[in-house]
């Protein structure tokens, strides 16, 4: 059965917000996510635009370009410093009414340390236009027989309507994934399934060619203690800090695929080393400590309390 309703990062984070912040406090504000005025502005409550989309997306760029619109919201909340800087530089948004509260994680089990000679399992759980073609190109070049990659890539994460309109564009990529001997194409699974199974993997590989404003799949993989390989495109370097192996983004995708193949092989050769084990322990602790929703929820609580009191 096709997933009926969108359940991407925006929806997941909103669910966490309602889980970790008191509903009575949330009832004092109106939060609109990403697309301005997709829900009407409230006449009396504090209006907050929680911005997670990129500055250049067509469904919001014209609204932000018109500075008369900026006064409509009491506060703008951005999911990364990268996102805030892009909106500030491109649109001159009100700096005194802007805050950064990053996305968070919840309920991530850590994987066991990899031991030499074990199978090496890679997970890729990103939508197909964000780099699946690069990943498949890289996997064709990977020769280590221990390495396999499970691909959970589909447009279904954004609901039935989006899936029916768009998924056929990527059938060729899905078919290619199914043909590769070291790739298992699985398709859509809900985030709850991904989180429950992350600890069974050793590596997360995301050759992103999409300007992420944050990256929840990277953060969850870091928390699970997976060795992460990604580009430095968009806000990925902010999400990952110093922990992933970063392959510098380039528009020559053939070169990028070759570099990712080399990165995967190099990482696989060192996964068993104590230094890498310690690195991944530190990575997991960092992600859990700074991005757990118990901490993120506290940031939201304090922000909303202040915003409500300021309007009284």
Please state what every model-predicted region is:
Residues 74-88, 93-110:
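Donor nucleotide-sugar binding/catalytic pocket of nucleotide-sugar-dependent glycosyltransferases
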Residues 114-131, 136-139, 150:
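Conserved donor-binding/catalytic core segment of Leloir-type glycosyltransferases
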Residues 227-230, 237:
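Short hydrophobic beta-strand element within catalytic cores of glycosyltransferases
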């Amino acid at each position: 059965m096709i997933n009926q309703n969108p359940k991407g990062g925006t929806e997941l984070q909103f669910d966490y917000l309602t889980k970790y912040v008191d509903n009575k406090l949330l009832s004092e504000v109106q939060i609109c996510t990403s697309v301005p005025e997709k829900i009407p502005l409230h006449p009396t409550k504090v209006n907050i635009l929680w911005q997670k989309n990129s500055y250049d997306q067509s469904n919001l760029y014209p609204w932000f370009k018109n500075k008369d619109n900026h006064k409509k919201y009491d506060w703008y909340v951005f999911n990364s410093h990268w996102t805030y800087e892009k909106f500030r530089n491109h649109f001159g948004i009100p700096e005194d009414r802007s805050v950064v509260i990053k996305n968070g994680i919840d309920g991530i089990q850590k994987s066991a340390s990899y031991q030499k000679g074990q199978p090496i399992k890679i997970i890729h759980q990103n939508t197909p236009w964000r780099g699946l073609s690069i990943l498949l190109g890289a996997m064709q070049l990977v020769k280590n027989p221990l390495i396999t990659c499970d691909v959970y890539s589909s447009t279904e994460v954004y609901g039935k309507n989006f899936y029916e309109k768009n998924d056929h564009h990527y059938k060729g990529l899905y078919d290619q994934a199914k043909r590769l001997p070291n790739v298992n194409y699985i398709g859509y699974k809900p985030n709850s399934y991904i989180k429950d199974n992350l600890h069974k993997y050793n590596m997360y590989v995301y050759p992103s060619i999409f300007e992420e404003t944050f990256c929840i799949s990277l953060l969850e993989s870091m928390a699970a203690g997976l060795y992460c390989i990604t580009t430095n495109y968009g806000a990925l370097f902010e999400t990952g800090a110093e922990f992933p192996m970063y392959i510098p983004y380039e528009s020559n995708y053939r070169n990028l695929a070759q570099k990712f193949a080399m990165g995967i092989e190099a990482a696989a050769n060192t996964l068993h080393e104590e230094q890498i084990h310690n690195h991944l322990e530190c990575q997991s602790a960092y992600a859990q400590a700074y991005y757990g929703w118990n901490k993120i929820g506290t940031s939201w609580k304090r922000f909303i309390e202040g915003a409500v009191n300021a309007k009284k």
